[in-house]
Amino acid sequence: MTKKVYVKTFGCQMNEYDSDKMVDVLNAAEGLEKTDSPEDADIILFNTCSVREKAQEKVFSDLGRVRELKEAKPDLLIGVGGCVASQEGASIVSRAPYVDLVFGPQTLHRLPQMIDARRTSGRAQVDITFPEIEKFDHLPPARVEGPTAFVSIMEGCSKYCSYCVVPYTRGDEVSRPLDDVLTEVAGLADQGVREVTLLGQNVNAYRGALTAGSSEVADFATLIEYVADIPGIERIRYTTSHPKEFTQRLIDTYAKVPKLVNHLHLPVQHGSDRILMAMKRGYTVLEYKSVIRKLRAIRPDLSLSTDLIVGFPGETEEDFDKMMALVHDMRYDTSFSFIYSPRPGTPAANLHDDTPRDVKLKRLQLVQATIEENVARISQSMVGKVERILVEGPSRKDPNELAGRTENNRVVNFPAPLAAHPRLIGQMIDVKINHAYPHSLRGELVLVSDDASAATH
């Protein structure tokens, strides 16, 4: 009987990418297949996030729930990976002795060896070292499950923002060689991938050697241009970028590379220069707005999303008003906004925080309500227009329908004959939007490519 692995992912797209690689590694080494049911699994892995306290505590809550599975099935292996693993290390085993494996983001490729060592020695295995880019040299080719894919181009972060734990859990920035990234993207394109999302903690800080060991370096703009030249790739996204690394060369790329989507996630974190300085972000509000102004001069309809932290230590009403002014000015189309969560070991954790919790909550609600209004307004403005979408697969709401995404990252559901589904998935098609919902759009098929058109008849 085929053995199975269950992976639960917390946090960012980097973790989603890493989770897929965990499955690929275990499939290549031991023939394990992915399951969506922890009860059916022979190995259960939690790929964790430590950016916020709530996510970290959720891991231990979930570990407590799978403990019963381990008691019923003693051969079941339980592993904790990701940033909580890097931060907590062996203390995870002390707190939850039934955990067999603890591994960091940079050592997931060592899972087969760790599993062998656990079975041989009977002792929990912990490996949270930072072997830089080694993991990419040991990962098997990706197994594609649709027309979109993530591609990690770098690891770590060297910005050391005062509130952020990522540099301590993922290490400093290390870029993959250019040819290594292009080989992976080309392999994905050969398997039918049409859209790639380039991933990094600060993806636009990419500085990759042209080849392994080469002294010549390619910047992020160069990488995008090369990816755009790969046959089959029709759309390029990236996340997460940093305002400090948004060079003029990268801005110019929006004019030169049509395949670069009309959507950008650029975290600002706050709208007050005083708070940005305390956060050690390395830019001012004016500098951030200057980047957006230049981009919108090239792409007037550029859709912009961001990250916002409310209630950072010392935040005054005046600081918050400046954040709200920025939210209105930038016309954000989605944000990931949260109340500040102090992370142990970061400089900001030692700052005096005298803002009441209920004040922070009210501020967060105001930010989120304002951005939701923006989202609704932008979605409504798309009604009646024809949008180009990449068909990703059956709709989650109705498997008899199909779903895809617009350039500005809106999900569009639309009816299509069942017989046409296999041929339409992976196609770029035109859909007329006829209804806007809070978190998706609905439309009808207008125009498809010749191959897809034949499939609808």
From Swiss-Prot:
Residues 380-447 form the TRAM domain. Keywords: 4Fe-4S, Cytoplasm, Iron, Iron-sulfur, Metal-binding, S-adenosyl-L-methionine, Transferase, tRNA processing. GO terms for cellular component: cytosol. PROSITE patterns: MTTASE_N (PS51449), MTTASE_RADICAL (PS01278), RADICAL_SAM (PS51918), TRAM (PS50926). Transmembrane segments: none annotated. Residues 3-120 form the MTTase N-terminal domain. GO terms for molecular function: 4 iron, 4 sulfur cluster binding; metal ion binding; N6-isopentenyladenosine methylthiotransferase activity. InterPro entries: Elp3/MiaA/NifB-like_rSAM, Methylthiotransferase, Methylthiotransferase_CS, Methylthiotransferase_N, Methylthiotransferase_N_sf, MiaB_methiolase, rSAM, rSAM_horseshoe. [4Fe-4S] cluster 2 binds at C157, C161, C164. It is found in: Cytoplasm. [4Fe-4S] cluster 1 binds at C12, C49, C83. Its main location: cytoplasm. Its EC number is 2.8.4.3. Residues 143-377 form the Radical SAM core domain. It catalyses: N(6)-dimethylallyladenosine(37) in tRNA + (sulfur carrier)-SH + AH2 + 2 S-adenosyl-L-methionine = 2-methylsulfanyl-N(6)-dimethylallyladenosine(37) in tRNA + (sulfur carrier)-H + 5'-deoxyadenosine + L-methionine + A + S-adenosyl-L-homocysteine + 2 H(+). SUPFAM superfamilies: Radical SAM enzymes. Its cofactor is [4Fe-4S] cluster. Binds 2 [4Fe-4S] clusters. One cluster is coordinated with 3 cysteines and an exchangeable S-adenosyl-L-methionine. Pfam families: Radical_SAM (PF04055), TRAM (PF01938), UPF0004 (PF00919). Monomer. Belongs to the methylthiotransferase family. MiaB subfamily. Catalyzes the methylthiolation of N6-(dimethylallyl)adenosine (i(6)A), leading to the formation of 2-methylthio-N6-(dimethylallyl)adenosine (ms(2)i(6)A) at position 37 in tRNAs that read codons beginning with uridine. This is tRNA-2-methylthio-N(6)-dimethylallyladenosine synthase. It comes from Burkholderia multivorans (strain ATCC 17616 / 249).
